[in-house]
């Protein structure tokens, strides 16, 4: 029989927290333990999924993309991380053959539904004093590696008006982000410079190169395209203004996805029956679930993140909220058994 899949990912970002991803995997194990202990009959088997590389070191979500059939050989052969190490090299160093990822695709006929329990990774639920978030859709995201190329000069002898200072180009672009969103985005739009590397990196040397990442998000793919176009135009204008060259490489482009209305209804009805407060909400962060939408009805359950903190060592969710999230997951699974 086709299975209902539950789970999430086990990896997190460097210096991340203990709840991101792991919550969904451990909660899945706990649900199955309860079902076995109480000998609850199932119409459809339940499988627990623990994916790898969700955080996008190489620009995608390797595990979920492999399972959903979203990988291409071209991407596998060319994906690399911000340091330049390729996915092929990283897998080979661990005795893995990247070609095998192409054979991990699940047959949609063998999958009945997918549900992912996850921390919100934001402040909305806590601020609204809600226990559960019923996710309506997952934001799209693009990731670029950008390079401004100028000229390294002596910081004492190079006049300010004759410099080709790569960092000044980066600083100008960072200042433009708010304008770009105001003119082209929505209240769901995000643009983030998360990593910067200045070269040669000496206190008394004008930076000749600035390498940085740019991550853009929105719930509309057209808005994402508008943001990307505006960013390209701004980068080009800034490069001319500061006598620089600029290059960019798109590491990934993940479309926004909508959750299954039926699975959303099941999660909402379950939450109501349990007496928990909740709200419908989008996910501003990317998740494994967005790839499973391509092959099966998919839903997500959020629980509050204390202070909205995530991707940091002090990431935390109260255990009472973890318990309630697990209860919603378990009872949604059982309700789906009878309604799919």
Task: Report each predicted region and the residues it spans.
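Short amphipathic alpha-helices in soluble, non-transmembrane regions
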Residues: 227-236
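A short beta-alpha structural unit
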Residues: 192-201, 213-215, 219-220, 245-264, ...
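Short beta-alpha connecting loops at secondary-structure transitions
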Residues: 73-75, 217-221, 251-253, 308-319
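Zn-dependent metallopeptidase/amidohydrolase metal-coordination segment
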Residues: 7-8, 278-328
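Flexible, small-residue-rich helix->loop connector segments that border functional cores
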Residues: 31-45
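Flexible, glycine/charged-enriched surface loops at secondary-structure junctions
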Residues: 41-45, 101-105, 157, 179-193, ...
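Acidic/His- and Gly-rich active-site-bordering loop/insert found
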Residues: 1-17, 35
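Midchain, well-structured core segments that form catalytic/ion-binding scaffolds
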Residues: 11, 53-222
């Amino acid at each position: 029989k086709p299975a209902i899949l539950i789970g999430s990912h086990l990896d997190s970002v460097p210096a991340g927290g203990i709840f991101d991803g792991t919550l969904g995997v451990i909660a899945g194990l706990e649900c199955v333990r309860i079902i076995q202990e109480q000998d609850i009959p199932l119409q459809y088997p339940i499988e627990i999924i623990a994916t790898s590389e969700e955080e996008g070191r190489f620009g995608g979500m390797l595990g979920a993309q492999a399972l959903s059939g979203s990988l291409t050989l071209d991407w596998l052969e060319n994906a690399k991380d911000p340091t330049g190490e390729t996915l092929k090299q990283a897998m080979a160093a661990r005795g893995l053959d990247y070609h095998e990822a192409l054979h991990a695709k699940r047959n949609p006929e063998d999958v009945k539904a997918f549900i992912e329990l996850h921390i919100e990774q934001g402040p909305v639920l806590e601020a609204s004093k809600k226990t559960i978030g019923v996710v309506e859709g997952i934001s799209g995201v693009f990731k670029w590696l950008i390079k401004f190329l100028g000229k390294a000069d002596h910081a004492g002898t190079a006049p300010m008006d004759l410099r080709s200072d790569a960092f000044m180009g980066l600083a100008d672009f960072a200042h433009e982000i708010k304008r770009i969103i105001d003119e082209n985005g929505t209240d769901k739009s995000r643009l983030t410079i998360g990593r910067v590397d200045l070269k040669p990196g000496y206190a008394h040397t004008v930076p000749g190169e600035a390498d940085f990442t740019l991550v853009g998000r929105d719930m509309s793919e057209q808005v994402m395209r508008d943001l990307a176009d505006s960013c390209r135009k701004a980068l080009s204008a800034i490069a001319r203004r500061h006598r620089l060259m600029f290059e960019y490489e798109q590491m990934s482009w993940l479309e926004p996805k909508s959750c299954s209305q039926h699975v959303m209804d099941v999660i909402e009805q379950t939450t109501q029956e349990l007496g928990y407060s909740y709200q419908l909400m989008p996910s501003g962060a990317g998740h494994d679930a967005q790839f499973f939408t391509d092959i099966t009805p998919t839903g997500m359950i959020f629980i509050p993140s204390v202070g909205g903190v995530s991707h940091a060592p002090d990431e935390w969710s109260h255990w009472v909220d973890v318990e309630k999230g697990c209860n919603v997951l378990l009872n949604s699974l059982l309700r789906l058994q009878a309604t799919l």
